[in-house]
Amino acid sequence: MKSSLIKNTVNKKVKFKKGDLVQILSGSDKKKTGEIIAIIHKTSKVIVKGINLKVEASKDLSKKVETGEITKFEAPIHSSNVMLFSQKNNISSRF
C-alpha cells in the first residue's frame, strides 16, 4: 500500500484534563462554561457537562406497547472549540 494512501493515525495531544472548567467558543452554546467529563483522544474531542445536549428517542422493542423514552445526552465537541476558563479571574485563555 502506498504511503500516501495510509491515513495518518497519530493522535493529537489534547491540552485539557478531565475536570477542567472550559468555555465554549463556537456553536449554539457559545460563551457557556462547563466541566469536562470525558476526553476522546482518537478524535480530539471532549464531552462537557450540560453543554451540547442532544435528544434521542428510543422504543422498547421487547414489549409490544409502543411507548418510548426520550433521553438527553452530551455530544462531543472538538477540542479547538473550547478554551480553559478561570473562575478566579473570570477570563478564558488558550494556555
Curated annotation (Swiss-Prot):
InterPro entries: KOW, Rib_uL2_dom2, Ribosomal_uL24, Ribosomal_uL24_CS, Ribosomal_uL24_KOW, Translation_prot_SH3-like_sf. Keywords: Chloroplast, Plastid, Ribonucleoprotein, Ribosomal protein, RNA-binding, rRNA-binding. Its main location: plastid. The keyword Cell division does not apply. GO terms for molecular function: rRNA binding; structural constituent of ribosome. It is found in: Plastid, Chloroplast. GO terms for cellular component: chloroplast; ribonucleoprotein complex; ribosome. GO terms for biological process: translation. It holds the Pfam family ribosomal_L24. One of two assembly initiator proteins, it binds directly to the 5'-end of the 23S rRNA, where it nucleates assembly of the 50S subunit. HAMAP family: Ribosomal_uL24_B. Part of the 50S ribosomal subunit. Belongs to the universal ribosomal protein uL24 family. This is Large ribosomal subunit protein uL24c. It comes from Porphyra purpurea.
